[in-house]
Amino acid sequence: MSNVYDKAHELKKAIAESEEFSALKSMHEEIEADEIAKKMLENFRNLQLELQQKQMQGIQITEEEAQKAQQQFELVQQHELISKLMEAEQRLSVIIGDINKIITEPLEEIYGNPEGQQ
């Protein structure tokens, strides 16, 4: 039987060589070269992080904060590079989610599938 760590490294390499990863990396490089896009994305991600931390601490997000986040999201989506980056992130996220489902299937045999998904 092959070593699972070797397989994990093969998977890492396959992800790094995938079209989806290459597209994401390329979009990051383009945004790094565009100061406006870089700053917009940075501000948006900082706001996201701030709100996530509040939620994790059990602090209620105000209506004003929710509106600000929505406005920031709409603003960054209007920027072509950032919008493309988010699409690339989503595509890679789907792949990683699918891979996660596949590699956790053996655990479902032991613990069952609480989500009832296949």
UniProtKB/Swiss-Prot annotation:
It holds the Pfam family Com_YlbF. Signal peptide: none annotated. It comes from the Bacteria. Belongs to the UPF0342 family. This is UPF0342 protein BpOF4_11360.
